[in-house]
Design a protein with these regions (language model features):
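N-terminal Rossmann NAD(P)H-binding glycine-rich loop of SDR-like oxidoreductase domains
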Residues: 4-24
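NAD(P)H-binding glycine-rich loop region in Rossmannoid oxidoreductase-like domains
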Residues: 5, 36-94, 98-101, 200-203
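Conserved beta-strand positions in the Rossmann-like core of class I SAM-dependent methyltransferases
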Residues: 5, 29, 156
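Conserved Rossmann-fold NAD(P)-dependent oxidoreductase catalytic core, especially the SDR/UDP-sugar
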Residues: 27, 35, 78-79, 90-136, ...
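Short, polar loop motifs at secondary-structure junctions
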Residues: 31-37, 160-162
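Substrate-positioning beta->alpha
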Residues: 88, 140, 158, 186-196, ...
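Conserved beta-loop-beta element that borders a ligand/cofactor-binding pocket
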Residues: 145-167
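Glycine/proline-rich active-site loop of Rossmann-fold NAD(P)-dependent oxidoreductases
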Residues: 167-172, 198-207
Length: 213
């Protein structure tokens, strides 16, 4: 059994990751501001209410943990499209510093296709639409990835394409070669499956694959 801290655990990929981790027999500490609302019941689940931007909360949550899975997300409304966000970079800066202080080395982080060197790799029309709608949000994910890559942590970055609520297929592709990167869709449950598999694997250590359903 591995002790996993999931940050951003109350919904979306984060909630799917908590559920998947529990199914695999791990002890999961589910970190979110609304952790008490997580609709799961398992003896290996520990709810932890906290703010990912507060260093004290994050340091306390790291106590006794072996691995961190960071699954932060934002609601992409009109204001977010126009103004962007600093959530990803601010929370990651707090997390990396806290992990180094607390001696927790393994970080598995969720960003997305379009972050880092996967930007503008979807084809002309896709990239135009993506940059118009998500460009400012992904500018901050670029900073998030840079902070992780620049650290001395044992990191893996997962970059899924467009997320859906379909059931897991377990037939998704993990793509490292930029020549094979393509836009598409992937189930959140499949992304969670990949994230949890990295808890006990170093196959993608210090790599940033694109996940395609």
């Amino acid at each position: 059994m591995t002790n996993i801290l999931v940050i951003g655990a109350s919904r979306g990929v984060g909630l799917e990751t908590v559920e998947r981790g529990l199914r695999e027999g791990h002890h999961v500490r589910a970190f979110a501001r609304s952790a008490d609302r997580i609709p799961l019941d398992d003896p290996n689940l520990e709810r932890f209410a906290g703010d990912a931007l507060k260093a004290n909360d994050v340091r306390r949550a790291l106590e006794g943990m072996d691995v961190v899975i960071q699954t932060l997300g934002v609601q992409t409304g009109p204001e977010m499209v126009i103004r962007g966000t600093k959530l990803f970079s601010k929370a990651t800066r707090v997390l990396v510093e806290a992990m180094q202080t607390e001696g927790v080395a393994r970080l598995i982080a969720l960003t997305g296709f379009g972050a880092g060197d996967s930007r503008n790799q979807g084809g002309c029309l896709y990239d135009l639409g993506f940059n118009a709608v998500l460009g400012r949000v992904y500018d901050d994910k670029n900073v998030q990835e840079h902070l992780i890559r620049s650290s001395d942590l044992a990191w893996t970055i997962a970059r899924p394409v467009i997320l859906t609520d379909r059931p897991a297929t377990h037939r998704y592709r993990v793509v490292l070669d930029p020549a094979d990167w393509r836009p598409g869709t992937i189930a959140r449950a499949d992304v969670a499956d990949f994230l949890v598999k990295q808890v006990t694997s170093d196959e993608y250590l210090r790599k940033a694959p694109v996940l395609i359903g």
